[in-house]
């Protein structure tokens, strides 16, 4: 797998887990009489809060309502709905791709690639290749150190040399 795809999957999984942990748990301020099929109420008594009681001996229960099936049909039948689930996934994807869009391109060694240096290196290679071709052409020409008394032409035309010169021009 590509590293970015793996990072995206992990990012979305962590985001979804944190969303379920935070948003699927709502505080209910009743005395735990409201209970649905797909919820689980955990209640604890807060002795400092004595509201809604006849005498001071009973306390008002602080209940937390946790949804037990948050991912059923993308949350359509759960307490927090499909709309917030899809919106959260969209926000997570946008944040993820904005983070990766700002990342600089890196080569295999892990160092940043400078576009100007890469262009210069490519140009230098092309010039060296061109010079090597020219050098090959000049190596075929015989070198004559003293031409003062020599009236013969530098290159003597032969049938095979002309054919090779035509190939070099292409």
UniProtKB/Swiss-Prot annotation:
A GO CC term assigned to this protein in UniProt: virion membrane
Domain of life: Viruses
Region described as Disordered: spans on this chain: 132-170
Keyword entries, A-Z: Glycoprotein, Membrane, Signal, Transmembrane, Transmembrane helix, Virion
UniProt-annotated location(s): Virion membrane
Membrane topology field: Single-pass membrane protein
Signal peptide: 1-24
Matching Pfam families: Cytomega_TRL10 (PF06084)
Biased composition (Acidic residues): 159-170
Annotated glycosylation sites: 48, 55, 107
Coiled-coil residue spans: none
Keyword Transmembrane in record: yes
Transmembrane residue ranges: 79-99
Sequence similarity: Belongs to the HHV-5 RL10 protein family.
Stated name of the protein: Protein IRL10
Source organism of the structure: Human cytomegalovirus (strain Merlin) (HHV-5)
UniProt lineage: Viruses, Duplodnaviria, Heunggongvirae, Peploviricota, Herviviricetes
């Amino acid at each position: 797998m590509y590293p970015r795809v793996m990072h995206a999957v992990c990012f979305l999984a962590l985001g979804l887990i944190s969303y379920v942990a935070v948003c699927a748990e709502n505080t209910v301020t009743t005395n735990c009489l409201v209970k649905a099929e797909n919820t689980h109420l955990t209640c604890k008594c807060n002795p400092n809060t004595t509201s809604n009681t006849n005498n001071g001996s009973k306390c008002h229960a602080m209940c937390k309502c946790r949804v037990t099936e948050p991912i059923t049909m993308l949350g359509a039948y759960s307490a927090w709905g499909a709309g917030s689930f899809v919106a959260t996934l969209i926000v997570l994807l946008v944040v993820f791709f904005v983070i990766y869009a700002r990342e600089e391109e890196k080569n295999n060694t892990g160092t940043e690639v400078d576009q100007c240096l890469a262009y210069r290196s490519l140009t230098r290679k092309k010039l060296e290749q061109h010079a090597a071709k020219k050098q090959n052409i000049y190596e075929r020409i015989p070198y004559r150190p003293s031409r003062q008394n020599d009236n013969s032409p530098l290159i003597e035309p032969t049938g095979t040399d002309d054919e090779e010169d035509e190939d070099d021009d292409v």
